[in-house]
């Protein structure tokens, strides 16, 4: 079975995916970064923590996973890791939380 590549989405498309695919929004930033605000409905799993690769096994591999970080670097790596672990529908937010917020999209402070 071919592995689907991670698809990078801009904030507009990320919003549509979040609403239409009812995906799980995964925030892979640190707890310190999360204090400054999150995208509504996100769950946090810090990509830099050693147990990250164990924690993702708790997630449903058939569910749509929408990943974001601060600027898009860690979310890309986290998304690749999800795909390697058999997740089928993985997307990440290009430009991360900063681009999302600066583009005027809603955040939970």
Indicate where each model-derived feature is located.
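Rhodanese-like catalytic fold shared by cysteine-dependent sulfurtransferases
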Residues: 1-23, 31-64, 73-109
């Amino acid at each position: 079975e071919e592995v689907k590549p991670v698809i990078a989405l801009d904030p507009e498309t990320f919003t549509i995916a979040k609403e239409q695919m009812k995906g799980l929004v995964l925030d892979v930033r640190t707890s310190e970064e999360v204090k400054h605000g999150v995208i509504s409905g996100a769950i946090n799993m810090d990509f830099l923590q050693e147990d990250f690769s164990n924690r993702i096994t708790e997630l449903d591999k058939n569910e749509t996973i929408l990943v974001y970080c601060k600027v898009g670097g860690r979310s890309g790596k986290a998304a690749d890791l999800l795909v390697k672990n058999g997740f089928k529908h993985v997307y990440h937010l290009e430009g991360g939380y900063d681009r999302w917020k600066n583009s005027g999209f809603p955040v939970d402070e």
